[in-house]
């Protein structure tokens, strides 16, 4: 069985994913999505990301830490010196179907060429969501970024509806959030979209009719100049 390599991340319109050693937002629903999606699979991360977890492996997953200088061994934990070595480790774990790359920025940049699919949570300010201005200048400050990519290589398999970003999954409906987010599932064109998984995501999160990929800024600028 071939190991599927997936990138999973939350990012802002400027492709920002982090500020220092923390996320620029707090989204319990997205964290729940992360836990459910990666549970039972292999997760790969850089050393700095691992340290933000207190150097403890994420439960219910096999953890691989990328590091050329440090070695990690433990229950559901090992280390690798390269992306290729990490993939090879995951490949020999017959009970694991996917390897999820979970950060940070440098690891995403190294891993994207090996990726078959991406699970991206797109975070936008409330003002942009209200006006449907997915490419507005309103963004979050970040010093760590997700790598750029384009629709020449990637297919949009699923886009969820907007969700309110609140501190609690049970927050009252009248609370006005400062930002919203959507779940996106993308697949490399050479791999294609899984119809069964797209139906599963649609059932869980709903869908939209938005067809314009949010990263295709060049298309948007050409459109505005017509």
Residue ranges and their predicted role:
Residues 2-226:
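Enzymes that bind and transform nitrogen-containing heteroaromatic metabolites
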């Amino acid at each position: 069985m071939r190991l599927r390599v997936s990138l999973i991340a939350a990012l802002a319109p400027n492709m920002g994913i982090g500020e220092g050693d923390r996320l620029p937002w707090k989204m319990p629903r997205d964290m729940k999505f992360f836990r459910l999606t990666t549970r039972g699979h292999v997760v790969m991360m850089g050393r700095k990301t691992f340290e933000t977890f207190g150097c403890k492996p994420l439960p219910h997953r096999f953890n691989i830490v990328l590091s050329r200088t440090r070695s990690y061994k433990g229950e559901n934990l090992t280390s690798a010196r390269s992306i290729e070595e990490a993939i090879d480790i995951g490949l020999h774990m017959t009970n694991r179907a996917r390897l999820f790359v979970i950060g940070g920025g440098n690891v995403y940049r190294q891993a994207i060429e090996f990726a078959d699919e991406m699970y991206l949570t797109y975070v936008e300010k409330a003002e942009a969501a209200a006006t449907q201005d997915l490419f507005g200048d309103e963004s979050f400050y970040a010093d760590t970024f997700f790598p750029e990519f384009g629709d020449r290589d990637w297919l949009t398999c699923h886009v969820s509806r907007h969700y309110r970003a609140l501190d609690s999954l049970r927050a009252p409906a009248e609370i006005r959030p400062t930002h919203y987010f959507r779940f996106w599932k993308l697949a490399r064109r050479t791999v294609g979209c899984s119809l069964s998984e797209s139906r599963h995501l649609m059932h869980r999160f709903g869908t939209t009719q938005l067809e314009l990929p949010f990263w295709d800024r060049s298309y948007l600028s050409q459109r505005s100049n017509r």
